[in-house]
């Protein structure tokens, strides 16, 4: 996503009849993503190279939008455990008014500069709710849900935020660009995890090991800019997956016949919370191990004391190396997390396939894969084909994401027993 679409173009699609439609949820999520992209000022292709926003709370704004909509809808159409211990609301309240108000209030809190556009389009959406009493009751529920979501998942003041310091020999030059990870990266209160380091993987293989030599050679051979071992399709996939777009699959899931709005809001909220914690855990591990990227290792291959590795002082990766430590792979942890959540939502091999697009290739077509595990394997391999990750790092990252997602699915926002549910009419 490059830049912010005019708010009217985005939010006009939010007008829906009661009860709230899948499009209401999807479009507000999409709108939140566009606001975040515009606020960060980064294009889709350079997000791994551009520092994160200085306002730490913005990094979790999208999750709070989804969480607020979930709590507002779940208060009316009670099907799940509340994450925020949010009380039940009026069964006759407008679900549209509740969901739209919840999203609007969260976005207004985090993006006050967009107040005029947000207010204008919020009013348009609310006008579609014809019953004044139901609209007002829904509005009040949405406002309360937004306040609850805004207050959750913030920075923990008890955690020290220590700026990154390059490790080097005194007097020796190192690159001066600091990693994209800000000091607040590991200072959030986790949504799911006990602590940021609770799923930290073991260390990368010893530089003198056979595993190191094998994975080093694989990325050297396949991931070089001028590699002759990589096929044209593999080159395309390495670039295609720099910034994957999962919205095609999420929309297919949301549009499935018989799904209630609260189910879709829960899907987006759970996904956001899992990805936030996965990102935090992956960042914590990266900063802990501070492991070198292939471009550094391969150019200095003689320094690892492994006779099975060959140095190539002129080696360059196919794609730009992200500006943070290598181990574990963040793309792979995200892929593992998404696969676990979506398998729970639509099955391991959804009838419509796993549909993904790309924001790193202009006008990218939607790719359809048979299963979520196929998609994870493709993402993992793409990072080696791009010359930025080793296979062992891909595997470690995937396991982080899967662990976080499984913890979430087993512990939060679970379906209520039928006797405790109160479904909206």
Each PLM stretch: what is its role?
Residues 1-8:
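Bacterial N-terminal signal peptides that target proteins for export
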Residues 23-425:
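Acidic/polar surface patches and capping/hinge elements
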Residues 17-19:
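N-terminal signal peptide c-region/cleavage motif recognized by signal peptidases
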């Amino acid at each position: 996503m490059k830049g912010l679409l005019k708010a009217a173009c985005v939010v006009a699609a939010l007008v829906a009849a009661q009860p709230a439609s899948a499009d209401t949820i999807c479009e507000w999520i999409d709108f939140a993503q566009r606001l975040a992209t515009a606020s960060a000022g980064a294009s889709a292709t350079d997000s791994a190279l551009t520092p994160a926003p200085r306002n730490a709370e913005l990094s979790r704004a999208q999750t709070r939008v989804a969480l607020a909509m979930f709590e507002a809808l779940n208060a009316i159409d009670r099907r799940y455990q509340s994450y925020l211990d949010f009380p039940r609301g009026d069964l006759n309240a407008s679900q549209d008014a509740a969901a739209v108000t919840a999203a609007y209030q969260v976005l207004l809190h985090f993006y006050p500069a967009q107040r005029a556009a947000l207010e204008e389009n919020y009013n348009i959406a609310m006008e579609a709710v014809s019953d004044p009493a139901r609209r007002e009751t829904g509005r009040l529920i949405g406002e309360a849900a937004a306040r609850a979501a805004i207050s959750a998942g913030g920075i923990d003041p008890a955690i020290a935020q220590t700026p990154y310091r390059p490790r080097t020999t005194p007097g020796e030059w190192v690159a001066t660009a600091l990693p994209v990870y800000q000091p607040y990266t590991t200072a959030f209160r986790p949504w799911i995890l006990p602590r940021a380091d609770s799923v930290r993987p073991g260390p990368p293989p010893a530089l003198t090991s056979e595993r190191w030599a094998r994975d080093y050679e694989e990325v050297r051979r396949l991931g070089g800019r001028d590699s002759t071992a990589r096929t044209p399709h593999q080159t395309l996939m390495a670039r295609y997956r720099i910034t994957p777009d999962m919205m095609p699959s999420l929309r297919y899931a949301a549009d499935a016949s018989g799904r209630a709005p609260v189910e879709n809001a829960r899907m987006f909220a759970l996904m956001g919370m899992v990805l936030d914690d996965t990102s935090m855990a992956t960042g914590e591990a990266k900063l802990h191990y501070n492991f070198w990227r292939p471009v550094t290792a391969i150019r200095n291959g003689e320094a690892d004391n492994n006779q099975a590795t060959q140095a190539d002082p002129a080696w360059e990766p196919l794609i730009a190396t992200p500006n943070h430590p290598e181990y574990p792979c963040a793309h792979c942890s995200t892929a593992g997390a998404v696969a676990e959540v979506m398998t729970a939502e639509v099955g391991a091999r959804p009838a419509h396939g796993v549909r993904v697009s790309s924001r790193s290739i202009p006008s990218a077509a939607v790719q359809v894969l048979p299963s979520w595990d196929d998609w994870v394997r493709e993402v993992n391999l793409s990072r080696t084909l791009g010359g930025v990750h080793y296979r062992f790092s891909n595997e470690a990252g995937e396991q982080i994401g899967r662990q976080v997602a499984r913890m979430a699915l087993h512990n939060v926002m679970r379906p209520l027993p039928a006797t405790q549910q109160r479904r909206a009419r």
